[in-house]
């Protein structure tokens, strides 16, 4: 059983460098890292780093295409590049826990399920009550936004399972689905600055 860690990236240089470095150390040798780079909006700095990764890390694949403002189509393009039995889709500015990566092969081998929803810890530095009220968010006493914020991330590489929706995309075509427990060590970590969050929300409103 092989896992494809599938990543989309545009201009997140510091984030993609940290993610690939950590993921390459945590994953098994037989699992692959697959990166889809937005050559239309991405930076030369990120592309140069990705080319460096091809010689620095084993079992990594890099592809450049143009993002056309449709997130489901973009993730379906990423699907086509993967060769694993399962795909773990990760955004460039996210980080999976070491416990999750260590245990994922066993979880997948012992549970015959099409999709696993992954809880996500979101934090936004600079977040104010004005932002919280405007976006109708929930923030707990740890500063986690909308926790457990389950994400569609781990799924079988099956032709009938595909992404849909231009934004806030979800998977369709699956027969079974389950959730990881809403505990920190099973989570993706997603830390942002308020400036980036505002820009992202404004962009989503245009789609």
What are these regions, as identified by a protein language model?
Residues 20-64:
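Acidic donor-binding segment of Leloir-type glycosyltransferases
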Residues 64-71:
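Short, acidic/glycine-rich phosphate-metal binding loop used to engage nucleotide
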Residues 38, 90-92:
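Active-site acidic Asp-centered loop
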Residues 18-22, 49, 77, 102-104:
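A short acidic, amphipathic alpha-helical/loop segment
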Residues 1-25:
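N-proximal low-complexity "stem/linker" segments adjacent to membrane-targeting elements
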Residues 87:
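Short aromatic/hydrophobic "clamp" motif used to bind/position activated sugar donors
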Residues 72-79, 95-207:
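Catalytic-site signature of metal-activated, phosphate-bearing donor transferases
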